Amino acid sequence: MAKDVHVVERVEVPEGVTVSIDGMRVKVSGPKGEVERDFSHARGVLIRLEDNSVVVESFFAKARQRALVGAIAGHIRNMIKGVQGGFRYKLKIMYSHFPINVKVEGDKFIISNFLGEKGLRIARIMPGVKVQVKGSDVIVEGIDVEKVAQTAANIELATKVKDKDRRKFMDGIYIYEREVIA
C-alpha cells in the first residue's frame, strides 16, 4: 500500500468570517451566525490555522487519511458558505386528487390528507433550520448544510408512497432545487 509523505489542503477564510480551532473542534462565525463541528473521529489528520487559511493535513497518509483530508476541507468550505449566506432547499407539493395540507408547528412539519389518509404524517425539522410554506412550495433554509438537507429529506421521506405503483401514484413532496444563498 503506497503512502503519501504529506497530504495538505488549504481552505481560504474570506473577510468577515472568523475560524477558531480547539484541538479537532472547528468553529466558524460569520454575518449569518455560527457553526461548530467536531472532527475528533478523524485519526491521523491535523487541522490548524495559518495566516488567513485553514490547513488540513496528514503525514504518511494512506488512502483513508487522504480521503479524510479532502472531506474535512469540504466540510469547512461548506461551513464558511453557510455563515456567509446560508443554504436553501425548495420542495414542491404534488398531488393529483386529494389536496395535501401542510403546516409547521415548532420543530415538526405536519402533513395531512396525504392520499386521502385520515392520519397525520410528521417530519422532524432539525434545530437551526427555518421552514416556510408558500402556496405549493416548501422552502427550507439554514446555515448548516447538513441540517438543511436532512430536514428536506425528512419532509420528502414522510410522503413516501408504499404498497402502490410509484409510476401511477406520484403524490408527494419532492426536492426540486438546492442553492447557496449569496
Swiss-Prot record:
Keywords: Ribonucleoprotein, Ribosomal protein, RNA-binding, rRNA-binding. One of its GO terms (cellular component) is cytosolic large ribosomal subunit. The keyword Transit peptide does not apply. The keyword RNA-binding applies. GO terms for molecular function: rRNA binding; structural constituent of ribosome. SUPFAM superfamilies: Ribosomal protein L6 (SSF56053). One of its GO terms (biological process) is cytoplasmic translation. Gene3D superfamilies: Ribosomal protein L6, alpha-beta domain. Pfam families: Ribosomal_L6 (PF00347). This protein binds to the 23S rRNA, and is important in its secondary structure. It is located near the subunit interface in the base of the L7/L12 stalk, and near the tRNA binding site of the peptidyltransferase center. NCBIfam families: PRK05518.1, uL6_arch. Part of the 50S ribosomal subunit. Belongs to the universal ribosomal protein uL6 family. This is Large ribosomal subunit protein uL6. The gene is rpl6.
